[in-house]
A protein has these predicted regions:
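Hydrophobic positions in the central parallel beta-sheet of the AAA+
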Residues: 245-247, 296
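Conformational switch/transducer regions in large eukaryotic molecular machines and scaffolds
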Residues: 235, 250-252
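Basic- and hydrophobic-enriched, low-structure N-terminal and domain-boundary segments
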Residues: 1-75
Length: 311
């Protein structure tokens, strides 16, 4: 009977080995069942080892709402083991997209792309590398009130950053309303900056507001924290006019993947906070000139996706 079970159209003779599985398991069985990979034209990214056919990719296709396209998901992730070629594949696709007319913004926290102007001379004139150091000339460039154009967006980002740094939850009925009120007052004023939030909290004069102000001010003692805080007098901003823009932040100290949020050091908190600001700014960049295909490339995205504000 057990042998007969393997014959097509045969009945089941033994019920001891039945496995109840989910739809995910069944879907996993179908992986590799087809040889259809990529598009019929586009960027050449490799070939199939089984068939020898070239594989082409058109990253802009999903964003155009083309009739008959299989997916309209705009996000893509590169996952794999260390040294598996994730960064190389990512860089290659971004590079070719720029050659095809796209505009790209890469958030490069590990500063691995600092020599692209020298190594890619054919497009050097269209590469803009923004290296944010702790020098005085860069003071306040990552302040939410400086980097975001819309005051409401600045206010929302300021809340995310300050609640992230201080650990104040929106469910905290005592501290959160006080912090929210101070940020709203700064948003409605003429001079906007995170240092002004500290001044508003001190002007409140209560024990809770003073405690929050002291907590926020304690972060400003670090040199590269000056990127996040301004007095509202910063007039310059980060320019993204070139085809390929790379934002690097020097001295970032990113936590290990295994480190829980509660175990983050002060430097790690500030580093992730800066990545949250830059990433929010990068996503805002997508909404400019919708006629141009744009790419926002978030390297080391896991570091800020581990916390609620980063997500």
């Amino acid at each position: 009977g057990l042998h007969g079970e393997f014959l097509p159209a045969s009945k089941r003779y033994l019920n001891d080995y039945i496995q109840y599985v989910t739809s995910d398991f069944l879907a996993g069985l179908g992986f590799g069942a087809t040889q259809m990979l990529g598009e019929t034209e586009g960027i050449y990214i490799g070939y199939s080892l089984d068939t020898g056919r070239n594989v082409y990719l058109k990253p802009a296709l999903a964003s155009q709402g083309v009739k008959g396209s299989v997916t309209n998901a705009l996000a893509a992730a590169f996952v794999g083991s260390l040294g598996g070629g994730k960064s190389f594949s990512n860089n290659m696709i971004v590079y070719y997209c720029v050659l095809f007319g796209a505009q790209a913004l890469i958030v490069d926290p590990k500063a691995e792309r600092g020599r692209w102007k020298e190594t890619l001379p054919e497009i050097a004139h269209e590469i803009n590398i923004v290296n944010l150091t702790s020098e005085e000339q860069n003071r306040g460039l990552l302040d939410p009130y400086v980097i975001m154009e819309n005051p409401k967006d600045s206010e929302s980002l300021a809340i995310d950053i300050l609640t992230f740094l201080t650990g104040i939850s929106s469910r905290d009925g005592e501290k959160f309303p006080v912090l929210r009120k101070a940020i709203r007052a700064v948003t409605n004023s003429e001079e906007r900056g995170l240092f002004k939030v500290i001044e508003e909290l001190r002007a409140e004069g209560t024990t809770i507001s003073t405690s929050i102000a002291d907590h926020i001010e304690s972060f400003t003692d670090y040199d590269f924290a000056h990127l996040l805080f301004s007095d509202g007098d910063v007039t310059q901003s980060i320019s993204l006019e070139k085809q390929l823009n790379i934002i690097q932040v020097a001295d970032l100290v990113l936590p290990d993947k295994e480190t829980s949020f509660e175990e983050y050091t002060t430097m790690e908190l500030l580093s992730v906070a800066m990545l949250i600001v830059i990433s929010t700014f990068a996503l805002d960049f997508i909404h400019t000139d919708r006629s141009v295909f744009k790419i926002v490339d978030l390297d080391e995205a896991w570091s800020f996706l581990q916390v609620a504000q980063g997500k």
